[in-house]
Amino acid sequence: MSLSFLLLLFFSHLILSAWAHGEKRLAPKGQPGPAATDRNPRGSSSRQSSSSAMSSSSASSSPAASLGSQGSGLEQSSFQWSPSGRRTGSLYCRVGIGFHLQIYPDGKVNGSHEANMLSVLEIFAVSQGIVGIRGVFSNKFLAMSKKGKLHASAKFTDDCKFRERFQENSYNTYASAIHRTEKTGREWYVALNKRGKAKRGCSPRVKPQHISTHFLPRFKQSEQPELSFTVTVPEKKKPPSPIKPKIPLSAPRKNTNSVKYRLKFRFG
């Protein structure tokens, strides 16, 4: 019995090995046979998970790259200011008869005694203390060249940045943020002469103490709606007056006949 049992085991082992070799030959290249998949199911699942992770990482990297390219394009685009920090109005210079700073579509900058469409300006903040000035009608920015000449620019550049300062007399001065005298470090200011023409900022006569550089902002303030409300004040009730105790009226006394006694003196 023992020999027959051993022979059966030997033949069964041979049959199984031959069947396994045949399956390997029939399977295509690069794909494991069923025996291999049955033997190592964990390995196949790990490979599948790694392949899915690689695909997800590549998919996530592609939108990131696209966003990066978009961000670089936005940085290269022109300056855009937020609409929340804008002030729309005019800048009035009290030099001479008084002029409103105006910007023309052809790039000319001067002053007009009467306010008009060209004198409607929009002042927006660029950074701390630095502002930009744009003409609403001309849609161009006030700029100062390297020679100190005022002109209008279609694009917002560093020449369009001005430093805004508040003076003691409630007027403002606007000096170029990048251009100044190299030797002395004197700033170049936006100024108008008595005839309403723009002065050169590099001129030694253009000083922050002179009225030609003083501008009064005249902004349109939006009318706030009238808020009406009623307040009900509770009426204070007067405390009840204390009740005076009733004093019983005493009955009138009857006049009793008074007896008069006479003193009698006895002598003797």
UniProtKB/Swiss-Prot annotation:
Tissues where the protein occurs: Expressed in neonatal brain.
GO annotations of cellular component type: cytoplasm; extracellular region; extracellular space
Bias (Low complexity): 43-80
Database matches in Pfam families: FGF
GO biological process: cell-cell signaling; fibroblast growth factor receptor signaling pathway; glial cell differentiation; nervous system development; neurogenesis; positive regulation of cell division; positive regulation of cell population proliferation; positive regulation of MAPK cascade
Signal peptide range in chain numbering: 1-20
Chief localisation class: secreted
Glycosylation site positions: N110
A GO molecular function held by the record: growth factor activity
InterPro entries on file: Fibroblast_GF_fam (IPR002209), IL1/FGF (IPR008996)
Similarity comment: Belongs to the heparin-binding growth factors family.
Subunit-level organization: Interacts with FGFR1 and FGFR2. Affinity between fibroblast growth factors (FGFs) and their receptors is increased by heparan sulfate glycosaminoglycans that function as coreceptors.
Involvement in disease: Trichomegaly: A morphologic trait characterized by unusually long eyelashes and mild hypertrichosis of eyebrows. It can be observed in association with corneal irritation, cataracts, and hereditary spherocytosis.
Protein name (database record): Fibroblast growth factor 5
Species, as recorded: Homo sapiens
Gene it is expressed from: FGF5
